[in-house]
């Protein structure tokens, strides 16, 4: 018995021994592989949930633990580390990066989000740090130069005109839609919905580029997919409130064109020297009537420094069952044209709930209200030249005229003999205002009845109501002639979407992993428009539609609708974590085509080889990651009118005193999908633990293009839409990023993107080799990209100072410069200029760096091989033809008998410069798109109080520098020509971000 008691006592002492071990204080630091401190890391005693601490800002910690215990250190983004105490007083830890944790999970289709390393498709992601605090009102503008192969060009800098032109891997169709599909949180949406979002609500933007990534979206993904994920709250997170504010000014990005116009003295001197007007004529027409001012009109027609500000408030957090994010924003920008402004208000609510282990649901809704007032004639040629001073061509007004009257008020009269009105006065009395009410969002339910089997049902809507009011004030027309006009219009547009998917993820063994997805999607698009207008109002106080004359009242109404129905499936298979394969199939049906041809099947196959996991590379330290990707698939394009396949009739003139009708559009029951095949291969990876790269080649072939084909004159129809012709785009994408410097409290990184795209028309219609479009100054030529077709300017004849043009050869598709003529014939002299309509090269680069709390980032974007016809130059470069307009200083270099090598002709002979290649300018450019300087206050300075957790001060600039040879208003405009458009704007903004 005694032996038994001794044995029990001994065992109790052995068990209790550790409990009586002596506690000692252990301290040390936790750093990463670069030697930088890791603040907030958890340092815990192994086996205990109550003994532990968190590292300070400098990575240090201090903790009292048993001398024979073990410390465990963990932090998000790093692998867990542990070390026995063994009586030591100092223990330092170096944490290794955990690539699996650091890697971002993104959504690329209808299923669960995936980590980038497991995605076979080509996907480029831009995070919120690049997008937030954007000076532009559009988040899409921030993508310029950020994604290889994605071309983003801004239309203008007019407040409220935040549209951009976006194409991926070239222009994939000659006449059907060429814009990507926009998806917001899983719901296909319009570009308008994206542009009416607050950029600070966006978590990330993923651009899906190859067939493996896009084929799941079928017919709408022929031009790529831009997937936008908005911010959301996190479960088990304390509530936080973040305020962001930005205040600054905007102005024209470039005023060099306006500054190159002549002053009054320069213009009058030029007229006399060039033999356009005599001094006597100038005296009698201007000076004797008191018109001896020197007005720089662009300074009066534009407000060059305008306020811009934005205020955001975000509340986010979550408990064990609910996560939430609520954000409100207000944005204001005053434009540089008189009366122009843009106001936007948004409210976003993103709430997710996990009430049961097998049930998840959520609501994500964005409401927006915007109000825009614009100059109705800015950039428009609707009124011809009679009102050219009302908009973007106002700088052509003669500088001898006054902008203000003798009382310092805006000059309200017509200038004698000119039929011209002061631009400011004209715009102030021609009001054009838009109110837009938008809603975009979705509701989803996710059920997981058994582990890894998920059923998801999602309903979404993207819609808006737009109200437009326009009027020409009666008091204005009473003083200047004409007729008052008042009009109102309303438009309603929405797209309703419902998606149901089932997804099952499983593995047979550790070497064989599968994910299977099947789904259904239905989309309904609807648009309706109504307008009413009248004229003849006589009093500003009674300027309503019903105050106009009875015979002037006009009412119009229209509507349009379309539907899509789709079924799809997707399979992912991973073999030994080294070989990943995916396959997609989708059937789409569209109401835009006849019932016999409206269904189409699209598919893709893709594979990825994770080379780094092979034995021959596993131990090669210079290679951190290396992946080879290959994919091929098909997509469709239905980007045409909703009723292009139907036979339509329209009203025409009277016959036998009865209203007549005519065939406006012939029926085409065989009209069907434009098709595309896309092959992509890529090599991605990381070398030497500092160089990230992504090299990609693509071949994109479009067939059965949706083209408006000319019809015989005897048919009475100009053109009809048919499936004809084919087009090819091929090219390379290069994305590089590497660390220049990285130390304990400083860093510097360089990133760059590059795309080269080769376009080629491979087939037209009716056996044609060339299809010139003279009014657009371009032509489609088999075997070539879309080319500029113009008369080719041959310079000035040194003998007589008259302009010359090259005579085309037998084949106008080949540039010929052998013979010249001085007799201009537009179509007869038109030939291939050798200049491409679409730029083959675009990209960008950024340099970012930081030291402690200070950070700087500069983003540049560029386009090479871009050309624009400067239509404006036809007016300011033709002083003999437009002798009552101002002109550019450059035309002073004109021909005289003593100056025979001049760039411009002998104006005294009435020489006229024509629409030819002298107006076709190189519009390639390099632009400092964004510059951001930020400073985050050290937490030690905030430690004296508990309210403010983080405080950041920022300075942001946009479009600060532009390098280009283009002499027009702005080289970034995506068009074949420019005419009176508003150039891009430049912003300077200061900001503050406070987190409570």
Would you name each region that the model predicts?
Residues 604-608, 733-736, 931, 984-996:
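Outer-membrane beta-barrel "beta-signal"
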Residues 245, 328-334, 581-590, 739-740:
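Transmembrane beta-strand segments that form the barrel wall of outer-membrane beta-barrel proteins
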Residues 101, 117, 159, 235-297, ...:
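Surface-exposed loop/interface segments of Gram-negative outer-membrane beta-barrel transport/assembly proteins
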Residues 230, 317-319, 330, 353-354, ...:
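Residue-level signature of outer-membrane beta-barrel architecture
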Residues 680-684:
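Glycine-centered tight-turn and secondary-structure capping sites
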Residues 1-348, 353-355, 360-362, 366-368, ...:
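Short, small/polar-rich motifs associated with maturation and membrane association
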Residues 66, 136, 308, 319-320, ...:
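Outer-membrane beta-barrel channels and translocator barrels
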Residues 837-869:
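Glycine-rich, aromatic-lined ligand/substrate-binding cores of catalytic
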């Amino acid at each position: 018995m005694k032996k038994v008691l001794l044995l029990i006592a001994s065992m109790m002492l052995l068990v209790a021994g550790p409990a009586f071990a002596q506690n000692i204080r252990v301290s040390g630091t936790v750093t990463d592989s670069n030697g930088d401190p890791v603040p907030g890391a958890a340092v815990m005693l192994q086996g205990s949930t109550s003994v532990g601490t968190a590292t300070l800002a400098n990575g240090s910690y201090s903790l009292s633990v048993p001398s024979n215990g073990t410390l465990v250190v963990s932090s998000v983004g790093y692998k867990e580390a542990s070390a026995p105490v063994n009586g030591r007083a100092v223990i330092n830890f170096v944490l290794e990066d955990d690539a699996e944790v650091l890697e971002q999970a993104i959504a690329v289709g209808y299923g669960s989000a995936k980590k980038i390393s497991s995605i076979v498709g080509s996907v480029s992601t831009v995070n919120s740090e690049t997008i937030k605090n954007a000076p532009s009102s559009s988040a899409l503008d921030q993508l310029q130069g950020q994604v290889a192969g994605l071309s983003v060009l801004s239309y203008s800098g007019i407040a409220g005109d935040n549209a951009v032109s976006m194409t991926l891997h070239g222009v994939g169709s000659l006449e059907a839609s060429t814009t990507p599909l926009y998806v917001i949180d899983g719901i296909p949406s319009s570009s308008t919905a994206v542009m009416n979002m607050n950029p600070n609500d966006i978590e990330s933007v993923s651009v899906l580029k190859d067939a493996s990534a896009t084929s799941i979206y079928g017919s709408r993904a022929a031009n790529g997919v831009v997937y936008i994920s908005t911010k959301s709250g996190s479960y088990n997170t304390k509530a936080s409130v973040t305020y962001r504010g930005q205040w600054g000014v905007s102005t024209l990005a470039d005023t060099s064109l306006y500054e190159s116009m002549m002053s009054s003295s320069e213009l009058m001197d030029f007229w006399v020297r060039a033999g356009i007007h005599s001094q006597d004529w100038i005296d009698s027409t201007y000076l004797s009537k008191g018109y001896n001012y020197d007005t720089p009109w662009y300074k009066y027609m534009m407000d060059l420094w305008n306020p811009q500000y934005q205020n955001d408030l975000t509340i986010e957090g979550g408990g064990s069952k609910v996560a939430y994010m609520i954000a409100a924003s207000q944005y204001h920008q005053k434009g540089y044209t008189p009366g122009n402004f843009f106001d936007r208000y948004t409210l976003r609510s993103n709430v997710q709930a996990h009430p049961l282990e097998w049930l998840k649901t959520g609501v994500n809704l964005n409401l927006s209200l915007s109000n825009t007032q614009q100059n109705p004639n800015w950039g428009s040629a609707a009124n011809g030249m009679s009102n050219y001073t009302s908009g973007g061509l106002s700088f052509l007004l003669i500088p001898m005229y006054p902008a203000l009257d003798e009382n310092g008020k805006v000059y309200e009269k017509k200038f004698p003999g000119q039929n011209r009105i002061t631009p400011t006065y004209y715009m102030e009395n021609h009001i054009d205002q838009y109110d837009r009410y938008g809603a975009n969002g979705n509701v989803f339910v996710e059920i997981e009845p058994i582990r890894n089997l998920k059923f998801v049902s999602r309903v979404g809507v993207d819609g808006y109501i737009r109200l437009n009011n326009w009027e020409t004030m009666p008091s204005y027309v009473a003083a200047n002639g004409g007729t008052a006009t008042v009009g109102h219009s309303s438009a309603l547009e929405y797209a309703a979407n419902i998606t149901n998917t089932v997804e099952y993820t499983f593995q047979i063994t550790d070497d064989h992993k599968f994910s299977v997805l099947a789904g259904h999607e239905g989309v309904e698009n609807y648009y309706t428009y109504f307008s009413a207008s009248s004229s003849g109002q006589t009093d500003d106080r009674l300027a309503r539609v019903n105050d106009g004359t009875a015979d002037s009242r006009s009412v119009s109404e229209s509507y349009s609708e379309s539907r899509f129905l789709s079924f799809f499936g997707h399979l992912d298979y991973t073999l030994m974590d080294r070989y990943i394969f995916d396959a997609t199939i989708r059937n789409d049906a569209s109401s835009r085509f006849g019932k016999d041809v409206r269904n189409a099947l699209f598919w893709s196959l893709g594979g990825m080889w994770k080379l780094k996991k092979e034995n021959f590379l596993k131990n090669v330290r210079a290679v951190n990651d290396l992946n080879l990707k290959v994919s091929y698939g098909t997509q469709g394009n239905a980007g045409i009118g909703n009723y292009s396949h139907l036979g339509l009739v329209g009203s025409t003139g009277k016959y036998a005193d009865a209203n007549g009708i005519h065939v406006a559009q012939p029926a085409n029951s065989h009209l069907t999908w434009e098709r595309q095949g896309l092959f992509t291969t890529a090599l991605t990876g990381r070398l030497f633990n500092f160089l990230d790269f992504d090299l990609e080649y693509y071949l994109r072939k479009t067939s059965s293009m949706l083209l408006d084909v000319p019809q015989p004159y005897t048919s009475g129809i100009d053109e009809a839409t048919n499936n004809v012709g084919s087009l090819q785009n091929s090219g390379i994408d290069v994305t590089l990023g590497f660390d220049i410097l990285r130390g304990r409290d400083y860093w510097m990184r360089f990133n760059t993107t590059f795309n080269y795209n080769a376009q080629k028309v491979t087939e037209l219609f009716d056996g044609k080799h060339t299809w010139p479009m003279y009014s657009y100054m371009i032509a489609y030529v088999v075997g070539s990209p879309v080319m500029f077709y113009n008369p080719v300017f041959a310079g000035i004849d040194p003998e007589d100072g008259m302009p010359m043009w090259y005579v085309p050869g037998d084949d106008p598709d080949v540039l010929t410069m052998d013979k010249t003529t001085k007799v201009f014939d537009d179509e007869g002299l038109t030939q291939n200029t050798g200049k491409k309509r679409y730029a083959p090269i675009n990209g960008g680069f950024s340099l970012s760096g930081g030291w402690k709390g200070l950070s700087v980032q500069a983003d540049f974007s560029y386009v090479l091989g871009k050309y624009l016809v400067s239509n404006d130059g036809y007016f300011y470069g033709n002083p003999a033809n437009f002798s009552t307009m101002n002109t550019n200083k450059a035309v002073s270099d004109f021909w005289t008998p003593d100056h025979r090598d001049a760039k411009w002709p002998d104006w005294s002979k009435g020489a006229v410069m024509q629409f030819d290649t002298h107006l076709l300018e190189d519009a390639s450019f390099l632009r400092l798109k964004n510059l951001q300087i930020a400073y985050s206050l050290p937490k030690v300075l905030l430690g004296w109080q508990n309210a403010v957790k983080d405080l950041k001060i920022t300075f942001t600039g946009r479009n600060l520098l532009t390098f280009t040879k283009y002499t027009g208003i702005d080289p970034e405009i995506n068009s074949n020509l420019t005419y009176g458009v508003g150039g891009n704007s430049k912003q300077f903004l200061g900001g503050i971000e406070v987190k409570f």
